[in-house]
Amino acid sequence: MSDKTPRYSRILLKLSGEALAGTKDMGIDTEVLDKMSLSIAHLRGLGVQVGIVVGGGNLYRGAQLQKEGLVGRVTGDQMGMLATVMNGLAMRDALERRNIKTRLMSALPIGEVTESYSSRNAIRYLKNGEVCIFVAGTGNPFFTTDTAACLRGIEIEAGLILKATKVDGVYDKDPSLHSDAVKYDGLTFDEVLEQKLGVMDLTAIALCREHDVPLQVFDMNKPNALLNVVMGENEGTRVYH
């Protein structure tokens, strides 16, 4: 662990469901969950306040059901929101096994399972040293968990929004399909929007641009990558105003 002071005192980490699946097609990879909880515990040890938004694509993918007309878009999105709750429960317990006090806050009221999301309460918990996991997206259909991550990051006044992926940044084309793909070290929000690079959906990018909150895309499987980003070291791709 570095002796340096972290560059960011409060961050919002976006974990996609696909990232939590690791090498599996579906479900939660326990090794990934364990590594991420350890990385977050390291950040807490440095005094960094951590909010997390989790996706649900590892547990539910509604495109096929919607394509075949079996469920409508609104229902499909609601099913996806519930999938994020399951991922959030798993992450909460993984963190609490490391003695990291964690709050699970949902955009949808779910009684005994979570508490309802409130930005004021979330900020208070973060200041008290607790990790906050935000689930159920924005609570509304038609909005992605990327948009939810940017919204929550803005609401909790995070200094940086981090997107954990399976690649080490943003490329001009898919590096898994093109050996000559070029990685960007830095991009402006306008460049991402103009080139349609797929960092996040356009609504999410526009939100961050409007509120001047930088994004960092990094490889969650690379050792110490999350720590390096928070310490201000060169890691992944930075997207800024």
Swiss-Prot record:
GO biological processes: 'de novo' CTP biosynthetic process; UDP biosynthetic process
Localization in the cell: Cytoplasm
Reaction catalyzed: UMP + ATP = UDP + ADP
Binding site for UMP: G56, D77, T138, G139, N140, P141, F142, F143, T144, T145
Range of residues in the leader sequence: none
Pfam families noted in UniProt: AA_kinase (PF00696)
Complex formation: Homohexamer.
Family: Belongs to the UMP kinase family.
Name of the molecule in the record: Uridylate kinase
Taxonomic lineage of the native organism: Bacteria, Pseudomonadati, Pseudomonadota, Gammaproteobacteria, Moraxellales
